[in-house]
């Protein structure tokens, strides 16, 4: 229920021939508090790559409440290949969710909820066919991060074919 607008956007993209994978997960603290991203919670997303000649754009989806206490979100991703080994270095990403000067929310909003899609890995080449796992980790300076409602991953073939 918490992912209705983001899920709706995902449903609309079902006709998108470039989309290889998209999934989003709701976040909650270990004690069950909704919309809290705990530093120990590392959502993983598993997707299959068949065409190793193609390039792929990898996006990170973020849903936040307007009460989120920062203008940005740092997260680190780890990509694991079909052989279970790292498929490149773990990278740190900064996503700007609100204007740093005005505090005005960015992204698509409905009420006090805002959805963002950030191009994190443009033109990614996957060297081996098979199943990949992408793990996200919040990299802010507090263990409990209230106001981040959901995160997700989208993988799309560059050129839409």
Feature roles, as predicted:
Residues 69-75, 147-149:
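Short coil-to-beta strand junction motifs in C2/discoidin
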Residues 53-56, 118-120, 124-138:
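Short tyrosine-centred short linear motifs in exposed loops/low-complexity segments
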Residues 23-44:
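Post-signal peptide N-terminal segment of mature Sec-exported envelope proteins
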Residues 61-63, 136-142:
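Short beta-strand-plus-loop segments that form exposed binding edges in beta-rich domains
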Residues 41, 93-98, 105-121:
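A beta-strand/beta-hairpin structural motif
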Residues 16-19:
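Bacterial signal peptide processing site
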Residues 141-153:
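Edge beta-strands of jelly-roll/beta-sandwich modules across compartments, strongly enriched
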Residues 11-14:
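C-terminal motif of bacterial Sec signal peptides marking the signal peptidase cleavage site
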